[in-house]
Amino acid sequence: MKKYDVIVIGAGHAGLEAAFATSNLNLQTALITLDEKGIGMMPCNPSIGGPAKGIVTREIDALGGIQGKAADATTMQMKILNSSKGPGVWAIRAQIDKIAYQRWFKQQIKQQKNLDLIIAEVSDLLVENNIVKGVVLSDQKIIQADYVIITTGTYLKSITHRGSVCVDEGADGTKNAKFLSDALVKLGFELIRLKTGTPARIKKDSIDFTNMILEPGTNQKIAFSHYHPVYKPYDEQLPCHIIYTNEQTHQIIRENLNKSAMYGGMISGIGPRYCPSIEDKIVKFSEKPRHQIFVEPESYELDSMYLGGFSTSMPIDVQEKMIRSLPGLENCEILKYAYAIEYDAIDPTQLYPSLESKLVNNLFFAGQINGTSGYEEAAAQGLMAAINVNQKYQNKEPVILGRDQAYIGVMIDDIVTKGVVEPYRLLTSRAEHRLALRNDNADDRLMKIGFEIGLLKPEVYDQYLNNLKQIKEILNWLKTTTVGQIDDLKFTTLKTNSYLIDYLKRPEIKLNDLLIYCPIKIEDEQIINKVQIQVKFEGYIKNQEENLKQLKRLNNIKLHAIVDYKEVPNISLETIDKLNKIKPLDLEQASRISGVNLTDIAMIKYYLERIKND
């Protein structure tokens, strides 16, 4: 068979991003997948974005990746989350048409140069002198390549669970990968067993939406892609809805806990802390009288609704009772029952920050096989693995994004340094530099890198530079124009010799209020938004950077005064659990614990200072 520069194993979100990046960088690429049905599949929530994750998709786009364009082209609803809070946590979320999303990617694959799609199962890796040389298919055919990127998602020896019923299959009834796990173990890789799950799907026409809380999209022009945006008109967007569980729901779950695959002992894999099953919520948060559920559309072409927040591994008969206890679903038709899925992943501490294996040269890993969760986290890793394959191909240093540079950098640093014990999910709280890692400035942080690598097209980078020039011109006008120079502003409470940039720092003043006097005519909302954030939050960003410098000098602070970390304010339950279990001696040791970030360290320091002064 033909020899390739790169083989990508798996055509999910990580694999697609990797394959398009390597082929766009003129590397001959083979994309191998078990089943065409799995290309770009969204087996769980049909959405892209959300807190931290939406910023990751913007970062992917800024580097020259493809996920943002795919999401913009196939969205059913767009929203800006956390808009009432500071810009450090603003995020875009899109409800995606999962049928259109897969179709979009399949069409792109057909048109893509340097990319061949192969439907087959990889059963082994071809390795000589600790260097990967290609793959062996299940029919014993060999495909040679200089580099291999493994992006197998949740398919390695995967098993689905509904109560005591276990099926040897992949997500949504697809094929699973039966042999590659053994091949990795043979090469010396340590594997971990993880678990995730997905809720039931309900027939839309059987739902009573009357008393549900409506969650519409936005009429603002927002998109993931910086300079190729596709906007979904508001009147074409599909609404989501919110309902809540009730005591009847909780009672059904409590009475049947022993039938749950997870609580009944059928599952050995560890599930995601930040996306727990509904039975996990009832057990761990027993004091809560209700839990929120999102009723969301899956496609313009499907009559199915997704129950976000209601995943379970209960048997089918119990699921029916649980679902029909929910408001509006009393008489619903269940199209597909929920299930949990167990799968193999590698311990990601066996990877360099480039995502290359420490055990086998030229072998890279990306996506859920690295212990992460989420389409966005997967795509980001696929992109970075592809970038670093190209860097190595050209005998260049790997591209390693810093924690102060991108959420992608935060994620990769976390997983390769600390490892994972449960599916890793990106959160804004994991980023100690989150005021600098905003939705609006992904292009400022990463487009130069994308352009220098060769992924970002020159015309896109030129447009970015032109925008940057306009931003500098506006900032210069604000810094050099006084209130007294504008007749309409002479009667404000500011002194007439005050500059407009100081006037803009007032919370009630918007940049658009001042631009009507500006000789530079700007209509691009993206530019206006960037300038406004830079001016209004300049002080906060500088303060955060200073605090981070101080935190680096805390290595010798001892923690023996803390008996129970529940007393420390504003740290997560995950952090409390791990600190109470490990009992670190000092802040340096605490900072190395998986899941403990610099924000947590700052809270511990604050608590120690407080009890010292009491």
From Swiss-Prot:
Q: Which SMART domains match?
A: GIDA_assoc_3
The protein's name: tRNA uridine 5-carboxymethylaminomethyl modification enzyme MnmG
Q: What functional role does this protein have?
A: NAD-binding protein involved in the addition of a carboxymethylaminomethyl (cmnm) group at the wobble position (U34) of certain tRNAs, forming tRNA-cmnm(5)s(2)U34.
Tell me the residue numbers annotated for binding FAD. 10-15
Q: How does it assemble?
A: Homodimer. Heterotetramer of two MnmE and two MnmG subunits.
Q: Which UniProt keywords apply?
A: Cytoplasm, FAD, Flavoprotein, NAD, tRNA processing
Q: Where in the cell is it found?
A: Cytoplasm
Is Transmembrane helix one of the keywords UniProt gives this record?
no
- GO MF annotations for this entry? flavin adenine dinucleotide binding
Q: Which residues bind NAD(+)?
A: 271-285
* UniProt cross-references to InterPro entries, sorted A to Z: FAD/NAD-bd_sf, GIDA_C_N, MnmG, MnmG-rel, MnmG-rel_CS, MnmG_C, MnmG_C_subdom, MnmG_C_subdom_sf
Q: Name one GO biological process term.
A: tRNA methylation
Q: Name one GO cellular component term.
A: cytosol
Which cofactor names does the annotation list? FAD
User: Is this entry keyworded Mitochondrion?
Assistant: no
Q: Which family does it belong to?
A: Belongs to the MnmG family.
